Each structure stands twice: as C-alpha cells, then as structure tokens.
Amino acid sequence: MRQMIVGNWKMNGLGAPSRDLVGEIAEGLATIPSPPQVVVCPPFTQLAGIGPLLKGSGIALGAQDCHQAASGAHTGDISAAMLADLGVEYVVLGHSERRRDHGELDETVREKTQTALAAGLTPIVCIGETGDQKASGESRDAIGWQIQGSLPDGFSGVVAYEPVWAIGSGNPAASQDIADMMGFIRAELVRQFGAAGKTIRILYGGSVNGRDAASILPIAEVGGALVGSASLQADTFLPIVRAAVDL
C-alpha cells in the first residue's frame, strides 16, 4: 500500500496564491518516481477553483469538514453531497480544532462520517489525546473512547492520529511514542472491526515536517501523514512527499 500524504490547509488560502500553490505541488510531484498518494484539503472557498487544476496531476481533492445532515436548514454549513458534486474525494472529520472550536463530540463525528460515506467520500477521521490526558497517563483511554465513539459500524475510511499537544508546536511526538500509539490504535481497530480493522489506513499528524518525516513514516502501522502548516508551501510540503517514496 502506497503511503498517503494529506495537506490540511486549515483557514488559509486566497484565490490566486492557492492556485499557484497547487501548481507548484503538481510540478514537483511530476518529478517524483512512484510518488505516494497526495491529497490537498483547501478551505471550502477554494475547492471549485482548485478542483479542475488537479485533473491528471495525481493529486486528489479533499475538504476539511461536512455537516452530518444530507441537506436542509443548516445555514452556513456544507453537505457531503455538495463536496462530492465539486469533485471532492476525501474529507477530514473530527479534527481537534473542530472539536475545540465548535464543540464537536464523538457522536457528531460519527454522524458526519456516516454521511460522508453515504455520499461516496472517503472520511479521514482524526483522533488524539490532549496534553493533560498524556500527562495523567490517560492517552490510551482517550484514544480508545474516540475510536469507539467516532467510527461507525462498517467504517472504511482513514484514521489520523494527531496528538493534540503536538499540533502547531513545531515538535512532533517522539518516534517511540508514535510507534506505541500506532500499535494500540491498530489493536483497537481490529478489536472493533475484526479483520477489516487490519486494513484501515492510519496517518500520523502533529507538526509533521520534512526534517522528521523520514523517521516518522517508516514506523510500523504509519500509513502516511496529515500535514498542517508545512502543506502551505510547496518547498516544505514536497520534502514530506519525497520521504514517503518506496515505503
């Protein structure tokens, strides 16, 4: 299975600079033999403009959220079907910033995941413990409950482990900590989903950069990376993509 590198642009990117960025990423990707799967997740406002630019580039289009309802009276929200209509293939759900800023619960993430799957999107469901949970030795309990609460029966998407305390810090988790948690997450997926849990891709996220990607991506059970700030420039994103080649 090829590695997957997902660029989460968060609330960044205006029209022309966003189009320039995907052009630079596409140019760089074209020079990489047997590249990994690459997904870019711009803000909603850039999806329609960027989608056509990705055709034939090997880069898939992703979004950063969707509403749990298929349609209806939800002012300001975006449905999974609307995303699919724009050519979106992936959607990030349950990111810690959504949970923090919008009070999203595991139940909400689960409902959004079901809606995304029904619309033909591949959900990338984020899980991760806080600094306080890590300090008190509750990391595994927190992750276990998130897996149980956020992933619906028959889940067939991607899981992204992002320790909340590492996001935006500039310092990813230590390799041994990542390895330990990845092993635990895999065991929990198998416990919850049986044999299907063995094939669910797990990404690592949390201050991933070109310097550390080469040591993170080869860790057992790591199937790729969910990249935040380093995805906002081609010269910081492409080194992560290159680190995933041949893994």
From Swiss-Prot:
rRNA-binding in keyword set: no
Pathway: Carbohydrate biosynthesis; gluconeogenesis; Carbohydrate degradation; glycolysis; D-glyceraldehyde 3-phosphate from glycerone phosphate: step 1/1
Enzyme Commission designation: 5.3.1.1
Cited PROSITE patterns: TIM_1, TIM_2
Domain of life: Bacteria
Record field: catalytic activity: D-glyceraldehyde 3-phosphate = dihydroxyacetone phosphate
Gene Ontology biological process terms in this record: gluconeogenesis; glyceraldehyde-3-phosphate biosynthetic process; glycerol catabolic process; glycolytic process
Active site: 95, 162
Primary location class: cytoplasm
InterPro entries given in the database record: Aldolase_TIM (IPR013785), TIM_sf (IPR035990), TrioseP_Isoase_bac/euk (IPR022896), Triosephosphate_isomerase (IPR000652), Triosephosphate_isomerase_AS (IPR020861)
Keywords on record: Cytoplasm, Gluconeogenesis, Glycolysis, Isomerase
CDD domains: TIM (cd00311)
Cellular compartment(s): Cytoplasm
GO cellular component, one term: cytosol
Positions that bind substrate: 8-10, 168, 207
Subunit structure, interactors included: Homodimer.
Entry function: Involved in the gluconeogenesis. Catalyzes stereospecifically the conversion of dihydroxyacetone phosphate (DHAP) to D-glyceraldehyde-3-phosphate (G3P).
Protein name, UniProt field: Triosephosphate isomerase
UniProt organism field: Gluconacetobacter diazotrophicus (strain ATCC 49037 / DSM 5601 / CCUG 37298 / CIP 103539 / LMG 7603 / PAl5)
Lineage per the UniProt record: Bacteria, Pseudomonadati, Pseudomonadota, Alphaproteobacteria, Acetobacterales
Gene behind this protein: tpiA
